[in-house]
Amino acid sequence: MDVDTAFLNSTMDEPIYVKQPPGFVNERNPDYVWELYGGMYGLKQAPLLWNEHINNTLKKIGFCRHEGEHGLYFRSTSDGPIYIAVYVDDLLVAAPSPKIYDRVKQELTKLYSMKDLGKVDKFLGLNIHQSSNGDITLSLQDYIAKAASESEINTFKLTQTPLCNSKPLFETTSPHLKDITPYQSIVGQLLFCANTGRPDISYPVSLLSRFLREPRAIHLESARRVLRYLYTTRSMCLKYRSGSQLALTVYCDASHGAIHDLPHSTGGYVTLLAGAPVTWSSKKLKGVIPVPSTEAEYITASETVMEI
């Protein structure tokens, strides 16, 4: 659901004055100014004011804000929980039945002017599909295709693995890039994919992110390879199966540093729910230099437990 002119629903927290806009100038008092009553697009505090407004509104109708994810709200009913995910002026509503969804929709439309955009098929860059049996799949197929087009990579060259072992990223013979913007742009797109719906590239992207300040030609070539891999496998998705046991399954592991990356270690974890990952990470262990590999394993396990 989309809230119409969302920012205008909030009220200003301090006096803000604007010039009279063309076509609305008071001829008798052309030097007068207007005082803004509601938040307006373009004001630095407008997003915060709207967020506070929608937060208070949802709490008034019985929703609780998730302590860890402030954009997620939930309310318990006898038929099951209702969830509302808020992203600026877009609300994603999940209810246990169409009847309860219609009831929540009526509550919200009494408070805001809103448009029901129908069953969700895309949200925050994710392609979302819900089958007739309740299975939900998430993919980044459209986002990846757009990123590949913008980066002008060779999409006809199929790539089945994200990195090439024969091209070490830590070699110093490769020349520095004169313009680092293309590299930073591609890595930014890869980071979005790695953090959103493609856990399989978490390690390669974490590795490439270490060279954002002074990338070399080998790094740009490797980043393009990861993007080609994403394009080749763009139909891959996360599938959450209806009726699966809602129990977390967690895996974590650590390496004791690659030969070119010693003495640091890389730690990673993945959390599965309903048959697919819900959280994951791969990053260099900072601040400590584990002596035995066992120490790296314990550090990674500790960070995994803290995430859960």
Swiss-Prot record:
Recorded coiled-coil stretches: none
Keywords of this entry: Transposable element
Keyword rRNA processing annotated: no
Pfam families the UniProt entry points to: RVT_2
Any one GO CC term of this protein is: intracellular membrane-bounded organelle
PANTHER family named in the record:
GAG-POL-RELATED RETROTRANSPOSON, PEPTIDE SYNTHASE GLIP-LIKE, PUTATIVE (AFU_ORTHOLOGUE AFUA_3G12920)-RELATED
> What is the protein name given in its UniProt record?
Putative transposon Ty5-1 protein YCL074W
Q: What is the lineage of its organism?
A: Eukaryota, Fungi, Dikarya, Ascomycota, Saccharomycotina
- Designated gene of the protein: TY5A
